[in-house]
């Protein structure tokens, strides 16, 4: 039985206790119902998400950040934090204040660098750099499209080349429409020979044809082609023309065709060219015609011992002697002396070469030995003729005569010693070239032209003592 003496305030009624219990249960149920809405996620995941969000915000802030470009001058100025310094500026830290200071190094460099900077835009540190993504993309395209690009470039190059050149058939067709014919050298020479050999051609046309023909026969193959279709004989027959101009230019063509062309030289001898050339030199002809004929004769005789034999048999030395003695043909004297010098030395070199090589079948040497040139020169009085030519006033002519005198020395030694005029001429020339050689030495020329001539004269005088 409950005590009766307890106060009423300390007594809990059963109804109140029941109400408190119901309130607690209701609160617990509501908490359990909303637990899913307010439950915590994985702590690590939340930390990473928070970090990524922070970095993203920082990048966005960095991307949207606008850097202020500092404009330095010639004086030191304080650099504020966040300011961009143009390239070429001088930056230092003030040890007293602890702040960075900037000034302009060179005004020109500063002005050039500021060209790329604009206010209100982000500073571009290096506009020529590439990102890693750019490089990866370019490399992928390069690997995929190299072969395709190469083939396209090659096709483009071929197309460009084709545009520069046109097919020969197309050109021929257009030339045919223009009445222009593409000719080979052979066809041109045939046309020129026909023009020269035509009775309907005028003198001017014949001379023009020969003049053009001389240009082509300088080539060895063309000269032999001229021989193959009979054009060479037509030109040789032109030496019989009554027109001096035709003789002159026919000899001009022959001289070019004979030069260093043995096959043409042989055919010319068989075609009677040598006889015709000597006849022109022996008769009264204009000097220009004789010059061209002498040129053709020299081309025919050089390096052709059989032609030299025939030249001696046909009285060639007598013809040349008469030519040199003509007063109107003195200009040809040096050319004649040069020809004789070439023929004498050519034979000497052939004999020396045969001895050095010890050729078992010296056919060429045998041909040269049959050329009795030196005895013929002595018999025809060429020892005296060459000595007289030493009196020519030209230095070049004297040089060639001195060379010829030296080549003929073994044959003409006695004649030279008995020639008083030659002795006086050599003495006079010795004094003249001593003075000229002294002038050369004063000008610093140790091996001058006149010194060489003086040496030749001294050597010849020594041999004749």
Curated annotation (Swiss-Prot):
Q: What modifications follow translation?
A: N-glycosylated. Ubiquitinated by the CRL2(FEM1A) and CRL2(FEM1C) complexes, which recognize the -Lys-Xaa-Xaa-Arg C-degron at the C-terminus, leading to its degradation.
Q: Which SUPFAM superfamilies match?
A: ARM repeat (SSF48371)
Q: Which GO terms describe its molecular function?
A: adenyl-nucleotide exchange factor activity; identical protein binding
Broad class of where this protein is predominantly found: endoplasmic reticulum
Ranges for the region named Interaction with HSPA5 and localization to the endoplasmic reticulum are: 1-260
Q: Where in the cell is it found?
A: Endoplasmic reticulum lumen
- Enumerate the InterPro entries for this protein: ARM-like, ARM-type_fold, Hsp70_NEF-Inhibitors
How does gene deletion manifest? Mice develop adult-onset ataxia with cerebellar Purkinje cell loss. Affected cells have intracellular protein accumulations in the endoplasmic reticulum and the nucleus.
Q: In which tissues is it expressed?
A: Expressed in several areas of the brain including the cerebellum, cerebral cortex, cortical neurons, glial cells of white matter, hippocampus, olfactory bulb, Purkinje cells, inferior olive and the choroids plexus. Also expressed in the eye and skeletal muscle.
Query: In Gene Ontology terms, what is a biological process of this protein?
Result: protein transport
Keywords, alphabetical: Endoplasmic reticulum, Glycoprotein, Protein transport, Signal, Translocation, Transport, Ubl conjugation
* Glycosylation, residue list: 197, 240
Q: Which domain of life is it from?
A: Eukaryota
Q: Which GO terms describe its cellular component?
A: endoplasmic reticulum; endoplasmic reticulum lumen
Q: Where is the signal peptide?
A: 1-31
The subunit structure is: Interacts with HSPA5.
Function (record text):
Required for protein translocation and folding in the endoplasmic reticulum (ER). Functions as a nucleotide exchange factor for the ER lumenal chaperone HSPA5.
Annotated family: Belongs to the SIL1 family.
Name of the protein = Nucleotide exchange factor SIL1
What is the organism field in this record?
A: Mus musculus
Its lineage reads:
Eukaryota, Metazoa, Chordata, Craniata, Vertebrata
Gene assigned in the entry: Sil1
């Amino acid at each position: 039985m409950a005590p009766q003496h307890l106060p009423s305030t300390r007594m809990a009624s059963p109804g109140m206790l029941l109400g408190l219990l119901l309130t607690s249960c209701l609160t617990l149920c509501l908490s359990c119902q909303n637990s899913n809405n307010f439950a915590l996620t994985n702590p690590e995941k939340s930390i990473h998400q928070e970090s990524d969000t922070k970095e993203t915000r920082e990048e966005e802030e960095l991307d949207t950040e606008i850097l202020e470009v500092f404009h330095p001058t010639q004086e030191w100025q304080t650099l504020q934090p966040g300011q961009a310094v143009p390239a070429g500026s001088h930056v230092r830290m003030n040890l007293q204040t602890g702040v960075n200071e900037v000034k302009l190094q060179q005004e020109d460099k500063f002005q050039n660098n500021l060209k790329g900077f604009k206010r209100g835009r982000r500073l571009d540190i290096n506009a020529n750099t590439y990102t890693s993504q750019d490089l990866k993309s370019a490399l992928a395209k390069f690997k995929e499209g190299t072969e395709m690009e190469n083939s396209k470039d090659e096709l483009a190059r071929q197309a460009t080349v084709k545009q520069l050149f046109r097919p020969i058939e197309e050109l021929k067709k257009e030339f045919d429409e223009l009445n222009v014919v593409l000719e080979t050298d052979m066809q041109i020479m045939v046309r020129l020979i026909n023009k020269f050999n035509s009775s309907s051609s005028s003198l001017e046309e014949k001379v023009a044809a020969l003049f053009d023909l001389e240009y082509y026969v300088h080539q060895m193959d063309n000269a032999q082609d001229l021989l193959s279709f009979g054009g060479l004989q037509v030109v040789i027959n032109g030496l019989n023309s009554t027109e001096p101009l035709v003789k002159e230019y026919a000899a001009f063509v022959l001289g070019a065709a004979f030069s260093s062309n043995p096959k043409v030289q042989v055919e010319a001898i068989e075609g009677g060219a040598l006889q015709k050339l000597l006849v022109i030199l022996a008769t009264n002809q204009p000097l220009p015609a004789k010059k061209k004929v002498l040129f053709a004769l020299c081309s025919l005789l050089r390096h052709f011992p059989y032609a030299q034999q025939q030249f001696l048999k046909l009285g060639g030395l007598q013809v040349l002697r008469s030519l040199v003695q003509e007063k109107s043909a003195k200009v040809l004297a040096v050319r004649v002396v040069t020809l004789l010098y070439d023929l004498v030395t050519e034979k000497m070199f052939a004999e020396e070469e045969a001895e050095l090589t010890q050729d078992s079948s010296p056919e060429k040497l045998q041909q040269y030995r049959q050329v009795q040139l030196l005895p013929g020169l002595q018999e025809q009085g060429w020892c005296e003729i060459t000595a007289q030519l030493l009196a020519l006033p030209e230095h070049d002519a004297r040089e060639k005569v001195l060379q010829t005198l030296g080549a003929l020395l073994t044959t003409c030694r006695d004649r030279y010693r008995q020639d008083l005029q030659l002795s006086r001429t050599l003495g006079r020339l010795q004094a003249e070239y001593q003075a000229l050689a002294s002038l050369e030495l004063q000008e610093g020329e140790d091996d001058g032209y006149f010194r060489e001539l003086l040496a030749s004269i001294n050597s010849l005088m020594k041999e004749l003592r």
